Regions:
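Charged, terminal alpha-helix-loop-beta segments
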Residues: 1-196
Length: 196
């Protein structure tokens, strides 16, 4: 049964690789949270979808809402996930010979996630003030993850791959994961469960 569900998830991915609706992907990940778990090395669950993490001013504006607030099951520490779409451009045009810059969409999403984390850390105590011990969560340097783009489709030559990997590995505080890599992990899980 579990393998069949994972195969349906992979079918949806195959049918929607070109789907540029962020709302579609948000709903899909929320309904199939096992997918989001593939980007972590330890078990997690969704604590909140579009959860308020702080930032409101006196006029009740400016609140910050990442796509997902995740919680590590054992430690109850948190992580923030922001999603874009598989069609989100990873790189801009060639900057110099053999060098590409990260796209405006990716750099903007990184700034967005870091702002969410900053507000979350500043407002943490007011957010958990009335929580019981069983409801309490922690914000000990919460991990930030951005899911965007499709490396297999976009990074078609070694210069683009190298530029992206250099930008990704030097992105302080935000882990960038492409959609194709997330679903590759689901595919690997299916193979393991089927004994392949």
């Amino acid at each position: 049964m579990a393998v069949d569900n994972l195969k349906k998830i992979l079918e949806t991915w195959d049918d929607n690789k070109d789907n540029s609706s962020e709302e579609f992907w948000h709903k899909f990940f929320e309904e199939n949270s096992v997918i989001l778990g593939q980007v972590f090395s330890i078990p997690v669950t969704i604590l909140g979808s579009k959860a308020y993490v702080g930032g409101k001013k006196l006029d009740n504006k400016g609140g910050k809402y990442p796509d997902y607030l995740m919680i590590y099951k054992q430690t109850r520490n948190t992580a923030l996930i922001e999603i874009k779409t598989p069609k989100t451009q990873l790189l801009s045009s060639e900057y110099r010979s053999e060098v590409y810059t990260i796209s405006r969409e990716i750099s903007g999403a990184i700034s967005q996630l870091l702002t969410y984390r900053d507000k979350f850390l500043k407002d943490y105590y007011s957010l958990v003030h009335n929580s019981s011990d069983t409801e309490r969560f922690y914000a000990s340097n919460p991990q930030c993850i951005l899911i965007a783009g499709n490396a297999k489709q976009e990074l078609c030559d070694s210069d683009k791959k190298q530029s992206f990997e250099l930008c990704r590995s030097n992105s302080q505080g935000v882990q960038i994961v492409t959609y194709d890599k997330v679903f590759e992990k689901v595919h690997t899980l299916v193979n393991l469960l089927e004994g392949k």
